[in-house]
Amino acid sequence: MSTTISTQRGQVYIGELPQDFLRITPPQQQQQVQLDAQAAQQLQYGESLGTVRRLSITVVQAKLAKNYGMTRMDPYCRVRLGYAVYETPTAHNGAKNPRWNKVIQCTVPPGVDSFYLEIFDERAFSMDDRIAWTHVTIPEGLREGSVVDEWYSLSGRQGDDKEGMINLVMSYANMTAGMHMSPPVVLMPTVYQQGVGYIPIAGVPTVYNQGMVPMGMPAAPTVAPQEAPCSEEDLKALQDMFPNLDREVIRTVIEAQQGNKDAAINTLLQMTEEL
């Protein structure tokens, strides 16, 4: 507790000063405005106190307009989001109806609201042939926790939106900032045949593998993200209820609903109604 004594220059405090000494307390309305501004900034970047957005993209299948292979066609997908590139496994002899069912987990940098998807025909003795592509805008509904199952038109040599369709399932989840899906594996320039409508980006190296590969970052120890609980028992039960849906699609829906079985069932029912 402080005491006051008088000197020639006036009164002075001796001892511990009060917490609000020489502080001007802003009015309550101004404090509320500052809190609202901070909350709006967090919502703008889609994150809050140490969390970043993670986008789950399930590349299910495609229905292509033409088989460009001499004897067979082995398609695979490449997804470019920000400065990272992801690839699916090759659907060997997938021809015009390849199925991948590949789940891609990736972080979304601030300001990025879309990704670029390409389909290649894997060649054994020549450059891989780029046969189809599309630009996908990330649906706004994902921010509210919904799961989007859509078919997107593909462009290619047949013309814009005339190369077929591709089925994607997308959802959002949060992960702790600083976690990495996997370290970089391959760094090399992209070389392949150019298709109609493709504009190459000169001077930008491409990083790719069958998982997350952030460009320009050193390798970091892999830390497993905290996934929503998804037991094999729940997965099998839902697979029995929805035999027409792929197992990995069901798993993605359960994880997107944070393990809530009832919410996952409602989402799967909506998906089956749209099929």
Swiss-Prot record:
Annotated motif AIM1, positions: 133-136
- Which GO MF terms does the UniProt record name? ubiquitin binding; ubiquitin conjugating enzyme binding
Q: Name where it's found.
A: Cytoplasm
The record places domain C2 at 35-152
Q: Where is the CUE domain?
A: 230-273
Q: Where is this motif: AIM2?
A: 151-154
Q: Which PROSITE patterns match?
A: C2, CUE
Q: Is Repeat tagged as a keyword?
A: yes
SMART domains attached here? C2, CUE
GO CC annotation terms, alphabetical: cytoplasm
Q: Name the SUPFAM superfamilies on file.
A: C2 domain (Calcium/lipid-binding domain, CaLB), UBA-like
| Family classification | Belongs to the tollip family.
What does the UniProt record say this protein does?
Component of the signaling pathway of IL-1 and Toll-like receptors. Inhibits cell activation by microbial products. Connects the ubiquitin pathway to autophagy by functioning as a ubiquitin-ATG8 family adapter and thus mediating autophagic clearance of ubiquitin conjugates. The TOLLIP-dependent selective autophagy pathway plays an important role in clearance of cytotoxic polyQ proteins aggregates.
What remark about domains does the record contain? Answer: Both ATG8-interaction motifs (AIM1 and AIM2) are required for the association with ATG8 family proteins.
The protein in question is named Toll-interacting protein B
Q: Which organism is it from?
A: Oncorhynchus mykiss (Rainbow trout)
